[in-house]
Amino acid sequence: MKVWKAALIPAGACALTWLTIHGRRDHPGWGKIEHTRFAHRGLHCSGVPENSLAAFRLAAEAGCGAELDVHLTADGYLAVIHDSDLFRMCGVEARVEDLTAAQLGKLRLEGSGEPVPFLEQVVPLFEGRGPLLVELKCTGGNHAKLCEKTLECLDRFGADYCIESFDPRCLLWLRRNRPEVLRGQLTQDFLRRGEGQSVRNRLALTAMLCNGLTRPDFVACRYQDRRMPLLGLWRLWGGRTALWTIRTPDELAETERLGALAIFENIDLEKGEGK
């Protein structure tokens, strides 16, 4: 019995490793984005709010890609904003998912004249320009509808794009329904930062245990957690990576030395300086 118990430990470690490193390695779409620097929520700065049309125009004009966040409104529109809670960006006590597009359209970002944009307004800015990195923000089990609506919108335009999400259900939906779309699993050290989640979920998300089922094309990890052992195994076995959020020239250089995509903000790419 002791022998069997001892054997279970390395067997479990091997199974964990297999689940973590199991991704797709041969997607041709990677070649379209592998040398791209993605502006985190657009090229926002003083007077130009994050995830605003102005920030995305600046990113497109600079030749960058852009990372953005998508939520579903109550009536099924695709709002581009990071937080579900609108207080930080719009100063109102409401959630994106509880408002209609018309109600959301009356709000302004950070007291500016910039409205909360919709995905159909952002995507055309990048046709013939840099690619988009679209993060799906699921709430209340709406992952399937969010995936479907987002892909319907993206298909209407000619911009290059890839999809990422913290929620493995989005990646599984993409694998089953749109396998041709480049997909990425977002992760971080949830054991340190997973407040409000069960220990089981925090462990599973940190270890990327769903990779064996969802088979992501890349993993996007918080820059500060880039040395997580299981992320190292992913990279060792040829897995592609992106790192967020890059805020200094030194971090940018380190990210690209590792061969990872950089999702950056507050860096002047022409001068190589932080803003």
Where on the chain are the PLM-derived regions?
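Phosphate-group recognition and catalysis centered on beta-loop-alpha active-site segments
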Residues: 2-275
